[in-house]
Curated annotation (Swiss-Prot):
Family assignment from sequence similarity: Belongs to the UPF0758 family.
Occurrences of domain MPN (ranges): 102-224
Keywords from the named record: Hydrolase, Metal-binding, Metalloprotease, Protease, Zinc
Placement of sequence motif JAMM motif: 173-186
Protein name in UniProt: UPF0758 protein NE1464
Organism in which the protein naturally occurs: Nitrosomonas europaea (strain ATCC 19718 / CIP 103999 / KCTC 2705 / NBRC 14298)
Pfam family, one: RadC
Domain of life: Bacteria
InterPro entries referenced in this protein's UniProt entry, alphabetically: MPN, RadC_JAB, RuvA_2-like, UPF0758, UPF0758_CS, UPF0758_N
Amino acid sequence: MAISDWPEAERPREKLIEKGAAALSDAELLAIFLRTGITGVSAVELARKLLTHFGSLTKLCAASLHEFSELPGMGPAKFAQLQAVMEMAKRALAEELKNGDIMDSPQSVRNYLCLSLKGKPYEVFVGIFLDARHRTIVTEELFNGTLTQASVYPREVVKRALYHNAAAMIFAHNHPSGIAEPSTADEILTQSLKQALALVDVKVLDHFVIGSSEVVSFAERGLI
């Protein structure tokens, strides 16, 4: 049955307008994004198939063009639309971090980092460069690596901090395994970065590890 034949209160678009986006399931939200289904399959049914295929909304959003286009009804146009939505969300969160002391918006920091790093199939190491008032100067992807690790070089991080005239930094990296628990190597690296940056008067405020369902803060753990 086409969505247009459903009772009005059950149609995703009308439901969103009446009750707000938070009232919709992942499949219903995705159906609004898709707009139409394919022959014999409604947009909601197609959305459910996509979520089942990828396993989660996070993995769907992190899919490559090749992975995305393998499925019926999907292609470069839909992929481009999805990437545009993701990028707009990231930029909106990044704007929040530039407007004041980043330490006053810990949840915004977590949201931004999750959106940027969660679901990536390889490890990515990110640095947020801050001014003396802890306002964001720029966020950079400093290093990336394999499924299990990224090689991080403190000397290169110091160079970037000096280039941006940063007074403080926040680091983050993802664990493609989905487990956010910091490793011993993560702790050693964080201390190495902290010591190297201290030599040029740059303070390390935190280091976040991003998993599939959890974010661990080194500062909250007392590891900074």
